[in-house]
């Protein structure tokens, strides 16, 4: 399968067809295999890439940098305090400046409208490293990981549940991705934390074409039954106030992924996924504060599940790099 995605932006999965997403996943697997075999060919030789980070990052930044270096490109990191973006210069103007200097631009920051504006005016491929609404590169990594651990199943035959804050960028993006790929997704969350109705309606329309099944439920046992994968994310996202913790912990604790929830799937081969970082113990500054305040060593997932044979979170994290590399090669490569 081959598609010409050259010069395309990668801003959200809604912009891509099922076959185009499948192509990116296949290219990711090929590039991963080549890296392990030492046969990788540099498709981005001589390219210059700007990485704009208005939010801090570990996996996304490292994945873009290593992927670019592997492919022969040079990168410039522009951090939260390292530019005039949004302070003395608009994103529209920034886009037109950077588009003259760079061959591709990654953006990780706030509203989706910002990366959309960047994509409109940059005149070079723009890639969404995360916004408040969507996290499309993470979904490619998730789906590649599911394919690797799916015991021979194709994506359209897989069932997975996302537990927790289903209205955040991960809930939104997993729902869009599942709709595009014909999957059975259950969003298991308090009703106040379901995705916006307009996005759900859009995904339901897509599902009618692809055979996907989208379920929104507050019932954990109902939501996880028969699942191949269980997925969660932090209960409080970057940029939200400290006051949000009290409300979230009270509302989300019933949606924690623990061994009881694993067993409720009825699937001995079920796997646990998380986009990371995760609050699964008290070994971080935030984790320690949470443990002291709420008496919980793990929040969205317990240490027992996170460190168990069910967990594939580090395979998932590695695949950030392979899938991001595929996006850059497909849209910018020679």
UniProtKB/Swiss-Prot annotation:
The keyword Transferase applies. Its EC number is 2.1.3.3. Carbamoyl phosphate binds at residues 57-60, 84, 108, 135-138, 275-276, 320. One of its GO terms (biological process) is arginine biosynthetic process via ornithine. L-ornithine binds at residues 169, 233, 237-238. GO terms for molecular function: amino acid binding; ornithine carbamoyltransferase activity. It comes from the Bacteria. It is an enzyme of class 2 (transferase). Transmembrane segments: none annotated. It is found in: Cytoplasm. Keywords: Amino-acid biosynthesis, Arginine biosynthesis, Cytoplasm, Transferase. Its main location: cytoplasm. Gene3D superfamilies: Aspartate/ornithine carbamoyltransferase (3.40.50.1370). It catalyses: carbamoyl phosphate + L-ornithine = L-citrulline + phosphate + H(+). GO terms for cellular component: cytoplasm. InterPro entries: Asp/Orn_carbamoyltranf_P-bd (IPR006132), Asp/Orn_carbamoylTrfase (IPR006130), Asp/Orn_carbamoylTrfase_sf (IPR036901), Asp_carbamoyltransf_Asp/Orn-bd (IPR006131), Orn/put_carbamltrans (IPR002292), OTCase_ArgI (IPR024904). Pathway: Amino-acid biosynthesis; L-arginine biosynthesis; L-arginine from L-ornithine and carbamoyl phosphate: step 1/3. NCBIfam families: orni_carb_tr (TIGR00658), PRK01713.1 (NF002470), PRK04284.1 (NF003286). Belongs to the aspartate/ornithine carbamoyltransferase superfamily. OTCase family. Reversibly catalyzes the transfer of the carbamoyl group from carbamoyl phosphate (CP) to the N(epsilon) atom of ornithine (ORN) to produce L-citrulline. This is Ornithine carbamoyltransferase. It comes from Vibrio campbellii (strain ATCC BAA-1116).
